[in-house]
Amino acid sequence: MEAVKTLIDRYGLADPATQDIGVFTNPILQQLYDQLVADGSNSLADALRVGAAIEEIDILDLEERIAQTDKADIQLVYENLMTGSRNHLRAFTSTLGKQTGDIYQPQYLDPIAYEVIVTSPTETGSGGQGRGQRQGQ
């Protein structure tokens, strides 16, 4: 999230984050958050499904945002976030299968795009983008 904060500061944008966990300034995000927390609170399987759904939404949102900018620094941060979301999607769906025997069905992604992601190996990002956070390099 440090990289996002750096971009917010660099471009003089208002920071929409609050200090309170689970509190959003955007009412649409707040409603989505509240619904997903309620949906995921029933069982481990439901929590894992909600986690996977969140990652699907994030991937689609990031793809849209990448296409809307020509700024390389913003694209890099979005691409790194998308790498994380794909890895998280793999983890949630894999854990769902191992822990419950359930097979996750994509809720937002195209089924082919989903299958490409979950059958691909775990990805690595660009480290700390030159801020000394790359391990072993």
Question: Language-model segments: which ranges?
Answer:
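All-alpha RGS (Regulator of G-protein Signaling) helical domain and cognate RGS-like helical scaffolds
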Residues: 1-136
